[in-house]
């Protein structure tokens, strides 16, 4: 009994000594922390606020960037063309997401030699909302069109994300290349707004499969847009890892050497027109064009007089130079 009591007493003294030593160590560690906070408390507070804002923005970036539910019926109703040869198509991506496409067929003279435009739309609505624009392209340019609904848009499955949209674009291009009724040497990418970033990425990764690139009212990158839209906040100082979606078009455009047409509406109130000008200047294409429309707004530049004339002239140049690249280096700025 006495032995057990002695052992218990020794263990108790050892535990008390350990607790006393631990407390002393904690006080030693806390002292520099307290001194640091007293000296740099304001800096630490600002850093905590900065990290908190970055965390909130990272979490809600998808909500701020993607609007598949605007208008409210966009996931339920997809307008379809009437009286026009078309196909309503569903394909699968590499990660097994089902995408919805609409193929509009040009059936006029020499239709077997017609170029095919893959149309990447902006960050809201669905492919049906782009039909008025697409049908005018069909008639004026004598081309086939494939309109793409990204994952999470229209009748496509999944949720939108930067990497997801890139995979969607690759799946669409792969599908187009399997069609025996499409001239695979005349594939043109068209991207408006967010679709421009998707088109630039696809072109940068598939230069050997793309005949030409057409960009309309798109941006340099999401960090550039954040600095523009939230100019009162220090967004320009956020490191890239704070951005869930980056879409670094200004870096990728330098890999796009195919003939390129840049369409800029100077009345765009969402994406500053200077971004289109910078993308044009960054482009290494030997055949590049910049068409400027002073009255063009973000979504409605295609309604400006001369819009389809600029596109038609560009496509005629492609046909005369036999895609994908002209031999002579030419650049041109047209104000319409």
Curated annotation (Swiss-Prot):
Belongs to the serine esterase family. Its EC number is 3.-.-.-. The active site is at 193 (charge relay system), 268 (charge relay system), 298 (charge relay system). It comes from Xenopus laevis (African clawed frog). One of its GO terms (molecular function) is palmitoyl-(protein) hydrolase activity. It comes from the Eukaryota. GO terms for cellular component: membrane. It is a single-pass type II membrane protein. Glycans are attached at residue 299. It is an enzyme of class 3 (hydrolase). InterPro entries: AB_hydrolase_1, AB_hydrolase_fold. It is found in: Membrane. Its main location: membrane. It holds the Pfam family Abhydrolase_1. Keywords: Glycoprotein, Hydrolase, Membrane, Signal-anchor, Transmembrane, Transmembrane helix. The chain crosses the membrane at residues 37-57. This is Protein ABHD13. The gene is abhd13.
């Amino acid at each position: 009994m006495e032995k057990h009591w002695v052992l218990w007493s020794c263990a108790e003294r050892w535990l008390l000594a350990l607790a006393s030593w631990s407390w002393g160590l904690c006080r030693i560690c806390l002292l520099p922390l307290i001194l640091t906070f007293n000296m740099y408390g304001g800096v630490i507070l600002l850093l905590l606020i900065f990290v908190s804002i970055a965390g909130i923005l990272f979490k809600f970036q998808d909500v701020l960037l993607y609007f598949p539910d605007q208008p409210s019926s966009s996931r339920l109703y997809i307008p379809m063309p009437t009286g026009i040869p078309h196909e309503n198509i569903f394909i699968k991506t590499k990660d097994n997401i089902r995408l919805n496409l609409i193929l509009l067929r040009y059936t006029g003279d020499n239709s077997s030699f017609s170029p095919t435009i893959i149309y990447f739309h902006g960050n809201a609505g669905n492919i049906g909302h782009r039909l008025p624009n697409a049908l005018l392209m069909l008639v004026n340019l004598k081309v086939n069109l494939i309109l793409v609904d990204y994952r999470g848009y229209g009748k496509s499955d999944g949720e939108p994300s930067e990497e997801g949209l890139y995979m969607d674009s690759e799946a669409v291009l792969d599908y187009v290349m399997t069609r025996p009724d499409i001239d695979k040497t005349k594939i043109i990418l068209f991207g408006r707004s967010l679709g421009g970033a998707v088109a630039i990425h696809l072109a940068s990764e598939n230069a050997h499969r793309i005949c030409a690139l057409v960009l309309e009212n798109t941006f340099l990158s999401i960090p550039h847009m954040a600095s523009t839209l939230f100019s009162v906040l220090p967004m320009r100082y956020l490191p890239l890892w704070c951005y869930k979606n980056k879409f670094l078009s200004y870096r990728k455009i330098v890999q796009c050497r195919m003939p390129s047409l840049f369409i800029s509406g100077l009345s765009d109130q969402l994406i500053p027109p200077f971004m289109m000008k910078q993308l044009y200047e960054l482009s290494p294409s030997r055949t590049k064009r910049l068409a400027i429309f002073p009255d063009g707004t973000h979504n409605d530049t295609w309604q400006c007089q001369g819009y389809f004339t600029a596109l038609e002239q560009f496509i005629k140049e492609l046909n005369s130079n036999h895609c994908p690249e002209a031999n002579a280096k030419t650049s041109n700025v047209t104000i319409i």
